[in-house]
Amino acid sequence: MIQLTIMKITGYGPWTLTLGSDREHELQMLQSRLYHKLQESFSKKNCLVFLNRSDEYFSVTNGLTLDDHITIQKELESSFDVKLSMSIGYGENPYDANLDAYEAKKSQKFLNEQYSIFGTLNGHSEHSVTIMHL
């Protein structure tokens, strides 16, 4: 069984326009700082973050609770102007966990609306984890 959390920057496109016409360096620096903070926050909880796209990340989050996710969201909120949504999925394998997270967000299945956290949680860490490779 695997629990997977997908993190996506909300309002990324419109936000990039606020940086002006010469913004690529600003975007690159923001993305690297955000990735660093995500990796730092999740690794403290024994998880690993992967970059999916410039505005999307995913993490294997077996054992993380809703409160753990909220704590990370609070850390991010205090550090960045941009916001992230989190979609948590749970399944027999990474593919099923990804589908579960996607469906939860698509159907607006909130676990915590204030911090934009959608999904399904297991919260157990005793299961072995299968890592997916993109």
List the predicted regions and their residue ranges.
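Regulatory and interdomain segments flanking nucleotide-handling catalytic cores
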Residues: 1-134
